[in-house]
Amino acid sequence: MELSGEYVGCDGEPQRLRVSCEASGDADPLQSLSAGVVRMKELVAEFFGTLVEQDAQGLAEDPDDALDGDDEDDAEDENNSGRTNSDGPSAKRPKPAS
Amino acid sequence: MQDPVEGLDGRAGLAEGEDSQLRPQAPDAQASSQNSATEGDHGNVPRSCPQDSGRPAAPGTLATPGSQAAPGSPSPGNTVGSGAAAEEAAVIPHSEQATLVPGRNGDTASTRNRHLEFSVTVPFRTAMEAGMARRSLVANARPQQVMVQQEFTANDSILAVRWTTDDPVLFRISINTFLDQLSLVMRNIQRLEFVAVVKRGRGRSRES
């Protein structure tokens, strides 16, 4: 008896997880299968844990984030240009006094 | 005496030459025949010889345009052919691009639209056990169908379960839940067998 799992990702490549559930001697086959299920849970947790981490890293390295950063820089430039415009009137005020 | 004879021979030779040259072209032949008649009338005058030599040049000049026309006609054809070839050359890359771009886009689209899949096969001892497990697990899985698609199949004594989703996190949650429930189902099956054995034992003791 073998408890098997297969994962197919975006690339279409299958990855298999296998757990042997051979009953030893007079042991109950269902008992062996239950032990196999426990082992499969461990494998699944390990496998998908790695997969989730890779997915998170992929999102972190997304080029769109860089573009978002550029947008922020552009916003700051606009703010600076606004400040420059606000300095204009203050420079003109001394002229009426003379 | 011989001189007049030689002169006649020369004229005859010229006439033959003109005829041979003009035979391929009927209009030129007629013109040359008229000229030859005139030449016959003025044959006594030696000055007419240079003029005669000049006149045959005209057919040559006429022939030249014909010869030019012959190579001229293929050249436009060649141009048309080269144009067609150019068009074909231009079209082929375009068609190739057309065939490649959809392929690339198709690959990209298929890659983007491809769902994640996970399947588990559980080998029970009997078809009855597999059926019992399937019925129990299907009922428990219904609330999760909204987020993750699950498919349960019992083939003889083999239970096969397949998940389809886009999010690996949901995968882990759903599969772990399934495995926990599977363990519970197996325990229940064992207990049912135990109860059955006990009942059989009691029946035998009563009979005895």
Curated annotation (Swiss-Prot), chain A:
GO terms for cellular component: cytosol; EKC/KEOPS complex; nucleolus; nucleoplasm; nucleus. Keywords: Acetylation, Nucleus. Residues 55-98 are annotated as: Disordered. It holds the Pfam family DUF4611. Its main location: nucleus. The modification N-acetylmethionine is found at residue 1. The keyword Transferase does not apply. It comes from the Eukaryota. One of its GO terms (biological process) is tRNA threonylcarbamoyladenosine modification. Residues 61-79 have a biased composition (Acidic residues). It is found in: Nucleus. Component of the EKC/KEOPS complex composed of at least GON7, TP53RK, TPRKB, OSGEP and LAGE3; the whole complex dimerizes. Component of the EKC/KEOPS complex that is required for the formation of a threonylcarbamoyl group on adenosine at position 37 (t(6)A37) in tRNAs that read codons beginning with adenine. The complex is probably involved in the transfer of the threonylcarbamoyl moiety of threonylcarbamoyl-AMP (TC-AMP) to the N6 group of A37. GON7 plays a supporting role to the catalytic subunit OSGEP in the complex. This is EKC/KEOPS complex subunit GON7. It comes from Mus musculus.
